Amino acid sequence: EGAINIETNGVNGVAIGAGLGGDIRIEKGRYDLYINGENGVAIGSISTPVNLNLLQADIDITYEAANGVAIGSVSQHADIAIKNTSISLRGSGNRYVAVGTLDGDGCSVDISRAHVDMNLKGNSCIAMGSDHGIADIRMTDANSRLAVQGEACFALGSRDGTGMLSSNNADLNVVVRNSLNIDISAAEQDIRLVNGRYMFILNNENIERKVVERY
């Protein structure tokens, strides 16, 4: 339950995890991670699938690598669960994903009773999701603030449009500035919002989405 500080730099760097991936479980404690260099991972894997569980932790990440992922797998599928955890993530790079996979066949991201605050800039970046395949994102009793800025950047989903967002009783605030004119890369019928508070701003325009109220 102490504090861990890790800084990576170089061609390929992983702060917590390994190039070979596998199961990674982080429970309790504070983690301050600074990622720099050419290809970087804060928590996860470079070349294999990863199953990540972040539980009851306080995680602060500064991601400044040119390419890679902050939390997840660079080149394979990533299953990520974030529960009772606080994550603050600042990103600046060329091509990267904050939570998910960059070149894998998709990802699942399950956020429950957690707080996630992201401020991302880059040429091609994604807050939660993947460049390819299905990105299945679920939020329950979560508080998320996602600010994303860059030519080919967006907040949630999969770059090929096969993302899915299911949110229940969440407080979700999304602000995106890009040239894609997309904030969530998913079909609107695959965006399901139940209860909670939601705000979506794309290129200074407010986007209204249906929120189902169930009490």
Predicted segments — roles?
Residues 1-36, 44-122, 128-150, 157-215:
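Surface-exposed loop/turn motifs in large extracellular/passenger domains
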